[in-house]
Design a protein with these regions (language model features):
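Helix-start (N-cap) detector for alpha-helical repeat units in TPR-like alpha-solenoids
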Residues: 4, 11-12, 45-46, 79-80, ...
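TPR-adjacent "capping" and linker segments in tetratricopeptide-repeat scaffold/adaptor proteins
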Residues: 1-13, 89-103
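Conserved structural position within tetratricopeptide repeats
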Residues: 5, 36-39, 70-73, 128-129, ...
Length: 186
């Protein structure tokens, strides 16, 4: 069997795993599987398109756009990426909102790294109100709440993140900590 054929088969297997994980809302697991798929076959537009959809779902719009543009460049005809890009551009203010969310997240991360947790918390609170599907922001806000020992607020953020990405390992870990400290551990 030729290497190219074998690589495509492995890529398809990882794509199928990613598709199943996405269907069960294990979006972080799906991202991992789809990235592996693309390592074996970078021309697999179905994997790129699904990866873009997942990135968009978890609030990482820039990464979603990147995957769809690459996909469209690889296959110009009969490609769903064209429709996805059209829908994102047609949604009034969506790209601007996503861009502002990413900037606020990065600023909050800098605040948190420089021991300015209050400003980071305030910025993230406003951000997740405007852009609640940004899982990383929910996760960082919950982590700040955990550090401040406000386990109930942390649990609320983590619950919102788990509604989007049901099996995110870090969110599940932080949720265990929050539950343990609120007495709600199972």
């Amino acid at each position: 069997m030729k290497t190219g054929t074998k690589n495509r088969q492995i890529a398809n297997a990882y794509y199928n795993i990613g598709l199943e994980k996405a269907r069960s809302r294990d979006l972080s697991g799906a991202v991992t599987a789809l990235k592996k798929s693309l390592r074996f076959d970078k021309y697999q537009t179905d994997a790129r398109n699904l990866l873009g959809l997942i990135y968009n779902e978890i609030g990482e719009v820039g990464s979603a756009l990147t995957q769809w543009v690459i996909s469209l460049n690889l296959q110009e005809q009969d490609n769903l990426a064209e429709e996805y890009l059209r829908k994102v551009h047609a949604a009034r203010g969506y790209l601007e909102l996503a861009d502002q969310a990413a900037k606020k997240y990065n600023q909050a991360l800098i605040y948190a790294q420089n021991d300015n947790e209050d400003l980071a918390t305030l910025l993230l609170m406003r951000m997740v109100e405007e852009f609640p599907q940004y899982v990383k922001a929910q996760e960082l806000l919950a982590l700040l709440y955990l550090h401040q020992e406000d386990y109930i607020k942390a649990g609320r953020c983590l619950y919102q993140a788990l509604k989007i990405d049901r099996y995110n390992p870090w969110v599940l870990h932080y949720m265990d900590i929050a539950k343990h400290n609120t007495g709600k551990a199972e």
